[in-house]
Curated annotation (Swiss-Prot):
Top-level EC class as recorded in UniProt: transferase
EC number: 2.5.-.-
Species whose genome carries this gene: Nostoc punctiforme (strain ATCC 29133 / PCC 73102)
This protein's name: Deoxyhypusine synthase-like protein
NCBIfam families referenced in this protein's UniProt entry, alphabetically: PRK00770.1
Lineage: Bacteria, Bacillati, Cyanobacteriota, Cyanophyceae, Nostocales
HAMAP family xrefs: DHS_like
Stated family: Belongs to the deoxyhypusine synthase family.
Entry GO MF terms: deoxyhypusine synthase activity
């Protein structure tokens, strides 16, 4: 008998009064259902504890389906999401709900030529009026003309201000369940966009630039702030978790915080402590969306000692997210809010000081093992530290 046996599969009939926790724990026994169960259990047991900083990346058309309101916002309110990377499209379509616009369930087999003639937009099996886009655009352009937006800023500050205005509209409309942007604003959760020009929000920013707007979204601010968040998670004695919904650019932007710290800044080399992903992308095509945790170890994105705490579930995020949300909301106590948005400047200042200190570090403070081989090595990190021979 193999020594690698796990828990015995002992199926019993599903009852008519089962709750979501028991359903997942007892009946998600194999294949990707088992990976989903393992993720739920890892989150509830280890990740959603007070000492872990949880970053979430969001790609795919999740918010048009309502998951910003139904799943992500409740996770934020319970302290289970500390910071996020999202596509701009997800944040744009999330605003429709906050502004009181209507989206409808359709089907993927409608006549798209006829829909275009009728002024109807389709996102697979979601449909809504073209006027929803126009009115959302008009709202964005109106508030972006305000004085608060007339400067260079990162996308966290930009989305914080957007969320502030959306929240005011929600209050006026009597919206009971806030959208993702408004909730993140209220709970101090910074949301970054890895490619701010790649969405209708970015398109409206670009249009206003033609009119003389001084708003500039600076990606360097985002790269440094997100690296500072990952750095602070460790410097404060805690751990860092990456929860990835889909893949794409948001996934990389979340994971690249670690190479930014060790490869570029030369400050540390560990990687994130926890990595869970829901994806339908294959690893054998070489794309980032399907890249495995073990591959990420080779880049220094994941701590190799924490590989047992990395799980990939190959499934649709629209199936996994509501199940995982229901599981942890029923299983876990709310965590104290970190309100990382309010601490951005302080943690970035700490990162900058440590980087500059390392860059100008006197030779007598260089570790002995490195100093002894200094003459044999020429390659250095940008901060000036020697890169060890491999």
């Amino acid at each position: 008998m193999s020594k690698q046996l796990g828990q015995k599969i002992a199926p019993t009939p599903i009852s008519n009064d089962i709750n979501v926790v028991d359903l997942i724990d007892q009946y998600f026994t194999a294949y990707n259902s088992a990976r989903l169960r393992e993720i739920c259990q890892l989150l509830s047991r280890d990740v959603l504890t007070e000492g872990v900083t949880v970053g979430v990346s969001l790609s795919g058309a999740m918010t048009p389906a309502g998951f910003g309101v139904s799943a992500l916002a409740p996770l934020i309110r319970n302290g289970f999401i500390d910071w996020m990377i999202s596509t701009g499209a997800n944040l744009y379509h999330d605003m429709h709900y906050g502004l009181g616009f209507e989206l409808f369930a359709g089907n993927p087999f409608l006549d798209d030529v006829k829909l275009r003639q009728e002024g109807t937009i389709r996102i697979y099996d979601i449909i809504f009026g073209y006027d929803v886009l126009l009115e959302t655009d008009a709202f964005i352009r109106k508030i972006l003309q305000g004085e608060a937006f007339q400067k260079r800023m990162g996308t966290a500050e930009f989305h914080y201000l957007l969320g502030k205005y959306v929240r005011e509209v929600e209050k006026q409309l009597g919206v009971q369940h806030s959208c993702l942007l408004a909730t993140a604003y209220e709970y101090g959760v910074p949301i970054y966009t890895s490619s701010p020009g790649d969405s209708s929000i970015g398109m409206n920013v670009a249009a206003l630039a033609l009119e003389g707007s001084q708003l500039v979204l600076d990606p360097s601010i985002d790269v440094n702030e997100t690296a500072a968040i990952a750095y602070n998670a460790r410097e404060s004695g805690g751990k860092s978790a990456a929860v990835i919904l889909g893949g794409g650019s948001p996934k990389n932007f979340l994971l690249q915080t670690q190479p930014q710290l060790h490869e570029v800044l030369g400050l540390e080399e560990r990687g994130h402590d926890y990595f869970v992903q829901f994806t339908d992308a294959r690893p054998d095509t070489g794309g980032l969306s399907g890249a495995t945790p073990s591959e990420a170890v080779s880049w220094g994105k994941i701590d190799p000692e924490e590989l047992p705490n990395t799980i990939v579930c190959y499934t649709d995020s629209t199936i996994a997210l509501p199940l995982v949300t229901a599981y942890v909301l029923n299983k876990c106590q709310p965590r104290p809010l970190k309100r990382i948005y309010d601490k951005r400047e302080a943690i970035l200042d700490k990162l900058q000081k440590d980087y500059l200190a390392a860059k100008t570090q006197p030779s007598d403070q260089v570790p002995a093992a490195v100093a002894e081989s200094a003459q044999k090595q020429t390659a250095t990190y940008p901060c000036g530290r020697l890169i060890p021979n491999t």
